[in-house]
Design a protein with these regions (language model features):
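Single conserved hydrophobic/aromatic residue that forms the stacking wall/gate
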Residues: 1-9, 13
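Active-site diphosphate/adenylate-binding microenvironment
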Residues: 21, 142-217, 222
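Short internal beta-strands
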Residues: 30-36, 91-94, 259-262
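Glycine-rich, acidic loop regions that bind phosphate or pyrophosphate groups
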Residues: 38-139, 319
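Short beta-alpha connecting loops at secondary-structure transitions
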Residues: 50-52, 57, 100-108, 201-207, ...
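Thiamine diphosphate
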Residues: 60-79, 189-267
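Conserved thiamine diphosphate
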Residues: 67-68, 117, 123, 127, ...
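Glycine/aspartate-rich loop-and-adjacent alpha/beta segment that forms the canonical ThDP
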Residues: 316-381
Length: 381
């Protein structure tokens, strides 16, 4: 049958199991799916990877798991139960026994080190020659990557710069061993989808708690711990507003952190969650200070970017300058992030939200949302 094992991975790197994961995938002809937390440790030099799964994931990752007959979960306490298949066999390997079966209906749970357990499995498994399922998922993944790349081609408009384009440029400019810190919210979405692993890069976020305003303090810690590595803080305007005092700390300790602000003038993820539930957004718009001027007042270099044509040159300048730099980029407040699988209830809720905006005299917001996300809307319908 056109089905096969699929494998979901979390924080495998800490168990130094990258080579073993590749070897197991090769032996089984199985696609590899990873979580956001595991992306930097799993994606690179991996011919079997088919993208990320979870709330911020991709359709290819989602369907690889749901179309498989067996799912092997390695080192992941996957929190998004709604994205896990419930009608296939699931095996889970984790060094912490309390995680086994906590989220998923597990048929086989093994407590142990991922690397050592895979090594033992490799000696016991016969090679699988049928690669039909793997090739099907890889083909789907190629289509997903083309769609993601297409969203970066349109740079946006004045004060409505497309965040996908910004993050793709950051990915190209950042060093191969950069440490990224991502604020919880929409910034996480763009980082998850457009920052690519190299085997040396690392990404920090509030992955377990999902708390706001984590990027800047994490960047400070990373810069102090690894003074020879490039540290890039990817902040939302909401998150940065909560940690403005940390800019003084960055200057005080002369930390060469590059702070990129995705300033959409709103609590974007909260706004999206309200819209999906059929509610017009309320109290999600932000009245922000001029973050570049705040940075200058604190003693660091600050840039404002409102024109999409100035994004690349400003980022180049920021990365080349010594010392801390803040780049405040005015991104599109209506940019949406689609989950890997859109449920009917989400579509209905979003439509209800747009209707309520219309009847409350906010028709321009509806028009702006459609104009900003026509490619996403085309995919859905």
């Amino acid at each position: 049958r056109d089905r096969s094992p699929s494998r979901g991975l979390g924080d495998v790197y800490k168990r130094q199991a990258h080579e073993e994961v590749i070897a197991l995938s090769e032996k089984l002809n199985a696609p590899v799916v990873y979580t956001f937390k595991g992306k930097m440790e799993v994606q690179y030099e991996n011919p079997y990877e088919v993208g990320m799964t979870g709330l911020l994931g991709m359709p290819s990752g989602y369907y690889s798991m749901h179309e498989a007959e067996v799912l092997l979960m390695l080192g992941t306490d996957f929190p998004y139960s709604a994205f896990l298949p419930d009608d296939i066999k699931i095996a889970q390997i984790d060094i912490k026994p309390e995680r086994l079966g906590r989220r998923a209906k597990v048929d086989i749970g093994l407590c142990g080190d991922v690397r050592m357990t895979i090594q033992a499995l490799l000696r016991m498994l016969d090679p699988k020659t049928d690669d039909t399922f793997l090739l099907k998922q890889l083909k789907r993944y190629e289509g997903v990557k083309k769609d993601l790349a297409a969203y970066t081609e349109n740079k946006g408009d004045i004060k409505k710069i497309h965040p996908e384009y910004v993050m793709s440029e950051i990915d190209k400019l950042a060093s191969d061993d950069a440490i990224f810190t991502v604020d919880t919210g929409m910034t996480c979405v763009w980082g998850a989808r457009y920052l690519q692993a190299t085997g040396k890069r690392h990404m920090l976020g509030s992955f377990n708690h999902g708390s706001m305003a984590n990027a800047l303090p994490q960047a400070i810690g990373a810069a102090l711990a690894y003074p020879d590595r490039q540290v890039v803080a990817l902040c939302g305007d909401g998150g940065l507003s909560m940690t403005l005092g940390d800019l003084e700390t960055v200057v005080q300790y002369k930390l060469p952190i590059k702070i990129i602000v995705f300033n959409n003038r709103s609590l974007g993820m909260v706004k999206l969650e309200m819209e999906v539930d059929g509610l017009p957004d309320w109290q999600t718009n932000m009245l922000n200070p001029d973050f570049a001027q705040v940075a200058e007042a604190m003693g660091m270099t600050g840039f404002n970017v409102s024109n999409p044509e100035e994004v690349l040159t400003t980022l180049l300048n920021a990365f080349e300058l010594d010392g801390p730099v803040l780049v405040n980029i005015m991104t599109d407040p209506n940019a949406l992030a689609m989950p890997p699988k859109i449920e009917l209830g989400q579509m209905v809720g979003f439509a209800q939200s747009m209707y309520k905006l219309l009847i409350n005299g906010r028709s321009q917001e509806v028009i702006d949302t459609i104009n900003s996300n026509y490619k996403h809307i085309r995919e859905v319908f």
